[in-house]
Amino acid sequence: MAQQTPLYEQHTLCGARMVDFHGWMMPLHYGSQIDEHHAVRTDAGMFDVSHMTIVDLRGSRTREFLRYLLANDVAKLTKSGKALYSGMLNASGGVIDDLIVYYFTEDFFRLVVNSATREKDLSWITQHAEPFGIEITVRDDLSMIAVQGPNAQAKAATLFNDAQRQAVEGMKPFFGVQAGDLFIATTGYTGEAGYEIALPNEKAADFWRALVEAGVKPCGLGARDTLRLEAGMNLYGQEMDETISPLAANMGWTIAWEPADRDFIGREALEAQREHGTEKLVGLVMTEKGVLRNELPVRFTDAQGNQHEGIITSGTFSPTLGYSIALARVPEGIGETAIVQIRNREMPVKVTKPVFVRNGKAVA
């Protein structure tokens, strides 16, 4: 039977259509996915993300451990509360998960990992942490609410006490701070400003209701997916998995190659892939009628006249832009246009960078 987050009852009271999402009963929408999408782009919306897993790591060798575990380098984290996005790779360079790591003190870091990969993530982390003497605490006592949109921070701040408002004042993106019983982070999955707020399970329902009263619109998985796709953000299991290199998933920027003597899991495989070349992730735009969908083939002819085929990893109609967009994994050599096979029709598409909307505006 699927698990329920501490906010399950609030979702049903708000009229949510609930679905099983990787073993969790989660809201798909509360009546209109499109309205929820636009609320985040123009005002403020919120998502229950309590199904994600918060993992606290403690021990004198925690930084050393994470420099080995992750492709990005936590040596970059020197200011308390600073966060970093990274892939956690296997020995062949495939992506076990993508995650966020927060630095608090030399012996205290926090990871936030995906729900779909929870068990394998915890097994992998535990296995590799043992030689470093790391104490691992899974924070199942915490719920998490993502408040996103141009007015999200201001509306959320009406629920904060003076000390909490002071703690987040001027906080830059990709930071987190523990302020009273709230862990408030300037992170998100929508391409908008906002907070991801972790708080004790028993306080989550009251906080959710207070956000509703403050004018924050409840949003479901449907809007979360169209928002993240417009923002060009990867979804685990679609843009990347254990068989796909981060180099083929527009995650090359998350790999810290320097210093050259840092050994991290998957490094040797990645160096070989970098030398020989990999597929790459691109954006696709189709302004003609129709919708680009996952797993549709993408065909193009390179400059030498050779024909190639890639695949759409995520596709949707973009509510913000008013036409269809997609992310696609394709061989090297793609130009400015390609063809997507939709049923029996060959549809022309424009090839773009893999990001379409940021802060409510189209990315040229």
Curated annotation (Swiss-Prot):
Protein known as: Aminomethyltransferase
EC number(s) per entry: 2.1.2.10
Keywords attached to this entry: Aminotransferase, Transferase
Taxonomy, superkingdom: Bacteria
Sequence intervals crossing the membrane: none
One GO CC annotation: cytosol
Catalytic activity, reaction form: N(6)-[(R)-S(8)-aminomethyldihydrolipoyl]-L-lysyl-[protein] + (6S)-5,6,7,8-tetrahydrofolate = N(6)-[(R)-dihydrolipoyl]-L-lysyl-[protein] + (6R)-5,10-methylene-5,6,7,8-tetrahydrofolate + NH4(+)
